[in-house]
């Protein structure tokens, strides 16, 4: 009888232990506006979160959970998180304490399994001061520009995926998030070296940015163009070539476009973005169908970029494709998504890993963008069609400096051999200096 009772108790104990969740990995992703901590767990769990002050801490209690992995220290670059401590409570629960460098606004949510990950508990720590700072910057950027001052074109560069979302992964282990960030940084450098243009990086490091947040960043900086950079993937490894996509109102233009849009738009599920931050104004704007002019401009700039990409290698389609990518839905900013090559193709995976090839791809994109804005620059920008009427005290050198063009190009545009100019003379200002 004692043996039977012992067996029953043993069985009950084993059953209870089997129900306990386990943390299998802890990942941290510091970003400019927050730090994200992701707990990879082997099943659903219940948790509570609360904040403590003096010193600033965030505490997360995970019910019926054990921790069987080593937790790394936060990096010195993390502006919010100083350290992580953990301990068992009641021999059943797990308490995790986040020691902070400054007060934060925490948020947590549980994510169900997807193709890449199992269950995950996500804890986001937002900088409390970031809200005020962001609001001030938005108001400042929204202020009317002085009509007498010429401005640079603003190009928003969006490196796809990031952080816990690696994007597609090639056979050699190449992660899309890494190669597109490398290309984006190269594109940024080349745009900085182009007269009349200024780059804005949507993602500057290895962290995830929500799809709608990417559009919002472009809008906050009043971008004239949004360029999202990706690496393609398809079930057939023989498929290769570059593609350029613009938004489709009526569905995707091909089977590959439909399949790809489903994969890319699912990134928010991988990245763990909740629906709390989708304000009504943005939602209504996204549903607005009055995008004819923007879609037309997107197609035109996309055509120019695709043509230039054809000089660096094979293009997958001869024409700009259309698909329902979330990041292309800004109603007032021309937007294109560039699939640089197929990571699912072994030879193109090798190409995307090559620094020289990354530079060529970026150079082709810049050439395509310049080709479009050469004839379509918005009024008030340095690249818009311009002329200058000579007044007393003007010199050719001073005019060239004011408009940011070289003296050589200014002379060439006006068929001038020397530096002699006359009051009342009208000079044409070249759109791009040196090209």
Please place each PLM-identified region on the residue numbering.
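Solvent-exposed coil/turn segments that connect beta secondary-structure elements
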Residues: 31, 42-44, 52-57, 62-67, ...
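Extracellular LysM carbohydrate-binding repeats and other cell-envelope/extracellular binding modules
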Residues: 386-392, 401, 406-435
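Active-site-adjacent mobile loop/cap segments within catalytic or ligand-binding domains
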Residues: 47-49, 60, 235, 286-382, ...
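Signal-peptide-cleaved, periplasmic/extracellular N-terminal interaction regions immediately downstream
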Residues: 17-155, 398-401, 406-408
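Sec-dependent signal peptide recognition
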Residues: 1-10
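Catalytic-core regions of hydrolytic enzymes
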Residues: 133-280, 291-303, 408-411
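N-terminal signal peptide c-region/cleavage motif recognized by signal peptidases
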Residues: 13-15
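Stable alpha-helical elements in mature extracytoplasmic
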Residues: 176-179, 183, 187, 214, ...
